[in-house]
Amino acid sequence: MSGRSKRESRGSTRGKRESESRGSSGRVKRERDREREPEAASSRGSPVRVKREFEPASAREAPASVVPFVRVKREREVDEDSEPEREVRAKNGRVDSEDRRSRHCPYLDTINRSVLDFDFEKLCSISPSHVNAYACLVCGKYFQGRGLKSHAYIHSVQFSHHVFLNLHTLKFYCLPDNYEIIDSSLEDITYVLKPTFTKQQIANLDKQAKLSRAYDGTTYLPGIVGLNNIKANDYANAVLQALSNVPPLRNYFLEEDNYKNIKRPPGDIMFLLVQRFGELMRKLWNPRNFKAHVSPHEMLQAVVLCSKKTFQITKQGDGVDFLSWFLNALHSALGGTKKKKKTIVTDVFQGSMRIFTKKLPHPDLPAEEKEQLLHNDEYQETMVESTFMYLTLDLPTAPLYKDEKEQLIIPQVPLFNILAKFNGITEKEYKTYKENFLKRFQLTKLPPYLIFCIKRFTKNNFFVEKNPTIVNFPITNVDLREYLSEEVQAVHENTTYDLIANIVHDGKPSEGSYRIHVLHHGTGKWYELQDLQVTDILPQMITLSEAYIQIWKRRDNDETNQQGA
């Protein structure tokens, strides 16, 4: 080998050794940098919150370029309260420091209770999502999430609104610092969002006449508060107000434990009606409300969904149709059936009657042929037992002619005259497309709360006509004993009823409005409610209205004895 080639060989060997030395020192340096990375990240205030010994092996073995993505994802996933998250923070020694911040949050004075309204759907104001919804307690808006890049987090940074309430867990948080706030001064907000009642409080509701004061200073009686008319839902408002003043039904829904464990088939949406009605009852009777009215927005959305848009918020509906559908839907959603299984709805409102039906020959037939047909079995009177939720009372036909002053005559009829339909003697003819029938009705069981629906609207081929006849009725002491047969009278000790709710329809059939008169049991006074307006009214004025739906309460033994004394 020549001298030149020997020198080149020694040079190449030396170069390899230097490159290997540089490569190994580079690897050592990179490993040292990787070991220092958590310390450097914590000193820079990085969002990394979990020490490396708690990271999965995949995260430890990942290249340095992937680690920041893992951190961001981990931070965004830590959103809801969970025990594993708290355990990890405890191992890191962060629980004590967070507890100190939780109990001494500096932003509690920024909460604005006057803008808080929990009556509307728990929906993010930016993304249409119900999941993980938070309410900003500074401006009252709803946002989704509280992790990094969530709408609530961005809102807190952009507008310096720091206090948020989880609308499902009822926990308070400070953002963007992301720690839970624990303070007893926030209990009033939690109670407005989800009112609760003890058995003792429920038992005393009808014995108290104490006024409550809202946050804005207005006073109100719990249970006698206005319902917001979103557009054309006053027909539903009146019915819901009436049902909220029926004590057994109200008491059942004020206590959520009575119905929350009822099992329904998978995918059943009807139970939503029960949940929303219970929430509305608790809000109407909340003595610690921030305002003296309630919005039935969530309740009506459930009605629209469960009725398949038969009843809507934006279109006027019929109060009797809505009442009939709502009571039957509520009964079904609570697990009731038509014949056997009972619910609170049937216990309160369901009565029974005998219906006697007799088919009539066609009026155009000769008299001899009619006489022969009446001897056939088909034309003999039949009787069936039937249950009812309400009684329909028929009004006499309104006059077509005007008086001498060119004004329409508004007739009047006593309540007992139209109740004669159910005395078991009075017959009424009913016509179908092909056949005519004579029917008579006799009551066999009177419910604790009796609903009268006065039939004011009749439909023909062209339009709906309203009967303006005024029904004269007493406010108290309506005895229905004479409408029962003798054997049924022996079973019923009390047959005397007092009025507790009176729904009125004013105006034309398609353009009219609804209002309601309700009795407050604690004060013994009557109040008129029309949407948000609440005024007291004299009992004598109630009888002058065009009553459409009435709810009567049967007296018990104690009340009857007091009246007799």
Curated annotation (Swiss-Prot):
Keywords: Cell cycle, Cell division, Hydrolase, Isopeptide bond, Metal-binding, mRNA processing, mRNA splicing, Nucleus, Phosphoprotein, Spliceosome, Ubl conjugation, Ubl conjugation pathway, Zinc, Zinc-finger
Function recorded in the entry: Deubiquitinating enzyme that plays a role in many cellular processes including cellular antiviral response, epithelial morphogenesis, DNA repair or B-cell development. Plays a role in pre-mRNA splicing as a component of the U4/U6-U5 tri-snRNP, one of the building blocks of the precatalytic spliceosome. Specifically regulates immunoglobulin gene rearrangement in a spliceosome-dependent manner, which involves modulating chromatin interactions at the Igh locus and therefore plays an essential role in B-cell development.
Zinc finger (UBP-type): 103-200
Catalytic activity: Thiol-dependent hydrolysis of ester, thioester, amide, peptide and isopeptide bonds formed by the C-terminal Gly of ubiquitin (a 76-residue protein attached to proteins as an intracellular targeting signal)
Modified residues (Phosphoserine): 46, 82
CDD domains, sorted: Peptidase_C19M
UniProt subunit comment: The U4/U6-U5 tri-snRNP complex is a building block of the precatalytic spliceosome (spliceosome B complex). Component of the U4/U6-U5 tri-snRNP complex composed of the U4, U6 and U5 snRNAs and at least PRPF3, PRPF4, PRPF6, PRPF8, PRPF31, SNRNP200, TXNL4A, SNRNP40, SNRPB, SNRPD1, SNRPD2, SNRPD3, SNRPE, SNRPF, SNRPG, DDX23, CD2BP2, PPIH, SNU13, EFTUD2, SART1 and USP39, plus LSM2, LSM3, LSM4, LSM5, LSM6, LSM7 and LSM8.
Disordered: region residues: 1-61, 75-96
Protein name: Ubiquitin carboxyl-terminal hydrolase 39
Compartments, record wording: Nucleus
Top-level division of the source organism's lineage: Eukaryota
Organism of origin: Pongo abelii
EC code: 3.4.19.12
UniProt-listed Pfam families: UCH, zf-UBP
Biased composition regions of type Basic and acidic residues, renumbered to the chain: 1-21, 28-39, 85-96
Crosslink position(s): Glycyl lysine isopeptide (Lys-Gly) (interchain with G-Cter in SUMO2): 51
Family, similarity comment: Belongs to the peptidase C19 family.
GO cellular component: nucleus; spliceosomal complex; U4/U6 x U5 tri-snRNP complex
Gene Ontology terms for molecular function: cysteine-type deubiquitinase activity; zinc ion binding
BP GO annotations: cell division; mRNA splicing, via spliceosome; protein deubiquitination; spliceosomal complex assembly
Residues in USP domain copies: 225-555
Residues that bind Zn(2+): 136, 139, 155, 161
SUPFAM superfamilies, alphabetized: Cysteine proteinases, RING/U-box
Gene name of this polypeptide: USP39
Main location: nucleus
